[in-house]
Amino acid sequence: MLVLDYLKAGLFVVAAAAALFAAAGTVAIPGFWAYLAIFAVVMIVSFAALDPDLLRERMRPGGEKPPLALRVFSLVLFAHWIVAGLDRGRFHWSDDVPGWLQGICLFTVAAGYALALWAMRVNRFFSSVIRIQTDRGQHVITSGPYAFVRHPGYTAGILIIAASGPALGSWLAAALVVIFSLPFLLYRTITEDRFLQVELAGYSDYAAQVRWRLVPGIW
């Protein structure tokens, strides 16, 4: 089973590379390689450092088709890779991102993934499906990044989304992924938080102690 999980993760990296380079029509774009290297390292670290049960939970289908919003999010993710490839490699619509900013955004993408891995490391119930994992004895997690915000995984997602387009050197890809993905993450945060306050024992008390959903001092 774990071997199959490795293959799924590897195929996702390959799909990202194919979308970028096929759209660009060239592999001679260093920024794309740096972006994919971060992606690959995240996958390797995930399997090396995280609980195998958590990885299986993350990849489970949830017994039904993924919610429409999640499917749209996945499509937007791939679409922004294709747009970045077309922009940088072929048409140069908006590929004037300064090198220094591209470097900062690559670092921000890496930081976002690091935050997500930290959240998954301390929270063995971290799931892509909104549900109470009674089969795994789910309880409230208050350590690590959960001591500062209630949904650090979505905070990480916002960092990655905000920085991904400029990291790839395309303002157009940045606009696409931010406009269509940020509302999804905010909606998902609100929906999940309401669900947990009703369904997960102790979560309401935790929410009273940790006031911020995504960004300390803001929201």
Task: Give the label of every model feature segment.
Residues 149-150:
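Conserved SAM-binding loop
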Residues 1-146, 155-219:
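Membrane-anchoring alpha-helices and their flanking helix-loop junctions
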